[in-house]
Design a protein with these regions (language model features):
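Conserved short histidine dyad/triad with adjacent acidic residue
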Residues: 19-23, 36-52
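Ligand-binding loop in jelly-roll beta-barrel domains
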Residues: 29, 67, 87-114
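A short, N-terminal "cap"/entry segment at the start of jelly-roll beta-barrel domains
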Residues: 1-33, 118-162
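Short strand-coil-strand connectors
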Residues: 31, 69-73
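Glycine- and acidic-residue-biased ligand/ion/polar-headgroup-sensing regions
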Residues: 54-56, 60-66
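Short, small/polar residue-rich loop motifs at catalytic or cofactor-binding pockets
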Residues: 32, 53-54
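Short acidic-glycine-tyrosine-enriched beta hairpin
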Residues: 72-88
Length: 162
């Protein structure tokens, strides 16, 4: 496959996201995670229900209020809510009749074998810490060196435990 640049960046005004859905696949050249933003005008919502073959989705509500229809259940949404939806569940979003609703949708496909370690706090526990090369804002800070020693020991204990 194609070699991607080592990072991609785009900027959207979080306080005034573009209306409806903004897909970030192309601007960010995504290959392993789906992400989009939504800004539904008051009283408006998806025009159809949808589900997925494999993709798990997380809806993150940044502002406003509304509902998400999950199967036959209406779930109220407000700023600060995070909702995970299993792939086969039919879903659709709608903003409140008086207030718009904006947020972020993140999607991913389960990969067999993750989390690899029972004690992991992250799902995709494939991080490779470089304990020797600190970011410039931490250089020379002995407290950070001590914190990192503890973190390294915790990570090694989790890996050893399986």
């Amino acid at each position: 496959g194609e070699i991607m640049t080592y990072y991609n960046k785009c900027n959207l005004p979080l306080e005034a996201l573009p209306e409806w859905i903004t897909w970030l696949k192309d601007p960010l050249e995504l290959s392993g995670v789906g992400i989009s933003t939504f800004n539904l005008p008051a009283g408006k919502g998806y025009t159809y229900m949808h589900s997925h073959e494999e993709q798990e989705e997380i809806y993150i509500i940044l502002s406003g209020i509304g509902v998400i229809m999950l199967k036959d259940e209406l779930v109220d949404l407000t700023a600060g809510d995070f909702v995970r939806v299993s792939p086969p569940v039919r879903r659709a979003l709608k903003a409140d009749n008086e207030v718009s609703m904006a947020g972020i949708i993140v999607g991913g496909v389960a990969k067999v074998g993750y989390s690899r370690y029972k004690g992991s706090s992250s799902l995709i526990d494939d991080g490779i810490p470089d304990w020797e090369n600190l970011p410039p804002w931490c250089e020379g800070n002995e407290k950070i060196v001590e914190i990192n020693k503890k973190l390294k020991a915790q990570r090694e204990a989790i890996k050893t435990a399986g």
